[in-house]
């Protein structure tokens, strides 16, 4: 099956490939100066030369940190049309037609009791959360669902931008 010539060709290809990699490594280290930089003490990591301390945004302890505009102000100027675009992220699991998907339907969610859709199988932590889905409660939940309701089945990571949350809530308010 294998004759001497086939084995010789395979060995030559392997050795040639290794030689090529060795030469390319040697050429690259010559061009890009890979290795010690000659700066600092023996064994010092090069990356340490670029580290610097970062002070907290609040300055001294006890100072209030400006977190931007409050939610009520942003909600007052929210754009439901922009919220409809943000709702595209929700469509994979939620519907607005009154039928449940992977998640409960969101038709009439603003003002509804938390875990209040009859017949939907909510997680125990969501059932225990209680309260109503006010715009403020939705805003907090949509920031980071897993932090607000630990153990929720909702896999969504959250909406980091306050404007996106306000626009989405304004859109959902119109879907009553």
From Swiss-Prot:
Membrane topology, from the record: Single-pass membrane protein
Membrane-spanning ranges: 12-32
PTM (free text): Binds 1 heme c group covalently per subunit.
Keywords for the protein's UniProt record, in alphabetical order: Cell membrane, Electron transport, Heme, Iron, Membrane, Metal-binding, Transmembrane, Transmembrane helix, Transport
Name this polypeptide is given: Cytochrome c-552
Record-level Gene Ontology MF annotations: electron transfer activity; heme binding; metal ion binding
GO terms under cellular component: plasma membrane
Source species: Paracoccus denitrificans
Localization per Swiss-Prot or TrEMBL: Cell membrane
Entry-linked InterPro entries: Cyt_c-like_dom (IPR009056), Cyt_c-like_dom_sf (IPR036909), Cyt_c_1A/1B (IPR002327)
Coiled-coil zones: none
Domain of life assignment: Bacteria
Classification of source organism: Bacteria, Pseudomonadati, Pseudomonadota, Alphaproteobacteria, Rhodobacterales
Function summary: Mediates the electron transport between the cytochrome bc1 complex and cytochrome-c oxidase.
């Amino acid at each position: 099956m294998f004759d001497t010539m086939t084995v010789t060709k395979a060995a030559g290809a392997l050795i040639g490939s290794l030689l090529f990699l060795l030469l390319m490594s040697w050429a690259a280290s010559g061009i890009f100066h890979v290795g010690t930089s000659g700066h600092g003490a023996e064994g010092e990591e090069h990356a340490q030369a670029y580290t610097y301390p970062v002070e907290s945004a609040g300055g001294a302890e006890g100072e209030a940190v400006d977190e931007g505009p409050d939610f009520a102000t942003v909600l007052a100027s929210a754009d439901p049309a922009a919220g409809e675009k943000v709702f595209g992220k929700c469509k994979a699991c939620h519907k607005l037609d009154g039928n449940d998907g992977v998640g409960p339907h969101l038709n009439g969610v603003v003002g509804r009791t938390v875990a209040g859709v009859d017949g939907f199988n909510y997680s125990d932590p969501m059932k225990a959360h209680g309260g109503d889905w006010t715009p403020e409660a939705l805003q907090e939940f949509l920031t980071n669902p897993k932090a607000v309701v630990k153990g929720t089945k909702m896999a969504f990571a959250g909406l980091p931008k306050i404007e996106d949350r306000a626009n989405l809530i304004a859109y959902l308010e119109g879907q009553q």
